[in-house]
Amino acid sequence: MTWMTTASGGRFDYGTPDLAEIHIADIAHALAQICRFTGHTRRFYSVAQHSVLVSRIVPPEHALAGLLHDAHEAYVGDMATPLKDLVPDYRAIEARAWSAVATRFGLNPVLPPCVKQADIIALATERRDLLPRDGRVWRVLENVVPRFERIEPLGSESAEALFLSRYREIAAAARRGVAAEPMPSPRYPRLRRALRALFVGDGPI
């Protein structure tokens, strides 16, 4: 068996992914329940919230690529990069899943450099706000300045709602023929509750 059951009851085949089985609601739900850094954060912090952060850092015209740059992890998980280097077969599976997701949402599988740059800025910010202060030097973060705004981790339901809200904002902007502007951070509980009420429970789109 080379397939898995998705949150909506569909099927994702790792060997030959069916684009019709890739839904933004499944991606949002799964990423909202996957913790960054394989769970070694001071508080739960999801890949979904990380993805929204990256979508805000990139230029507006690349917001969708920023939001979905880790969308394949909804199907293959978020393996730590040092471990990926020891499991070459995983990278091939990851690349196949990413190619399918990118095609499904009209993205070039080769992401623009600004997405990688934004990912590194997000990493620097996450290290400052969420990881233990171990004093070690991360070469990948040399000369990288974290964002001024601190990260307030959201629970999985709020992160899922935030991801879907951001996706719909970007999609609406694309339909109008304009680039999506970064949306404000939902740091207030009332806004979080409103987002949850609006978007949690949506079916696949």
What positions do the PLM features span?
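Metal-dependent phosphohydrolase cores
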Residues: 1-205
